UniProtKB/Swiss-Prot annotation:
PROSITE patterns: N6_MTASE (PS00092). This is DNA N-6-adenine-methyltransferase. Belongs to the N(4)/N(6)-methyltransferase family. GO terms for biological process: DNA restriction-modification system; methylation; symbiont-mediated evasion of host restriction-modification system; symbiont-mediated suppression of host innate immune response. Its EC number is 2.1.1.72. It catalyses: a 2'-deoxyadenosine in DNA + S-adenosyl-L-methionine = an N(6)-methyl-2'-deoxyadenosine in DNA + S-adenosyl-L-homocysteine + H(+). Keywords: Host-virus interaction, Inhibition of host innate immune response by virus, Methyltransferase, Restriction-modification system evasion by virus, S-adenosyl-L-methionine, Transferase, Viral immunoevasion.
Length: 173
């Protein structure tokens, strides 16, 4: 049974990442991100960022360690872009995505990522674009996907972290 979203269409792709999720990813992967590839001025996690108007699918990525929380309505082109930036341009990319094993983009992650960290026991309370507050309206589980240059094909590592542990560790930053 599919869970229907109650999010207004105008906000569907605009929810921001809580800081503690971003900090956890930096800590877990031992990365200091220098580019936020899908952001707006009011919600970027890094000084260097790409806006929707600049279009991360075509823009030059001026960073080596890239954070990406893409629009969830159509993640496939963003997954493909992250893979190509990693393979062709020597970028390390961490994506925050829904867990949906029935999709082509999920299969692309499994085939190309170095590691996938599944977030368990709850769902990320993303930041509502209108209110700036964490929301409990997220209807799908999430995962962190790490793409690294020269990661050997078929070397995927799967890891798990509870949302509670992620928040606890991420808030220490």
């Amino acid at each position: 049974m599919m869970t229907k979203s109650n999010t207004k269409k105008s906000d569907k792709d605009l929810w921001a990442t809580p800081w503690w999720v971003f900090h956890y990813a930096e800590q877990y992967f031992n990365i200091k991100f220098d580019l936020d590839t899908c952001a707006m001025e009011h919600n970027t996690k890094v000084k260097n960022f790409i806006t929707p108007e600049q279009n991360t699918l075509t823009a030059d990525w001026q960073g080596r360690y890239c954070w990406m929380n893409p629009p969830y309505s159509n993640p496939l082109p963003f997954v493909l872009r992250a893979i190509s930036q990693s393979v062709l341009h020597n970028k390390t990319v961490v994506m925050l995505l829904n867990v949906d094993g029935s999709t082509k983009w999920f299969d692309m992650c499994v085939r190309n990522a170095k590691e996938i960290v599944y977030i368990t026991n709850s769902r990320i309370p993303f930041i509502n674009n209108e209110t700036g507050e964490e929301t409990d309206q997220n209807n799908k589980p999430q995962m962190l996907v790490l793409f690294e240059p020269k990661a050997p094909y078929g070397s995927l590592k799967s890891s798990y972290v509870s949302l509670h542990e992620m928040k606890e560790k991420g808030m220490l930053q």
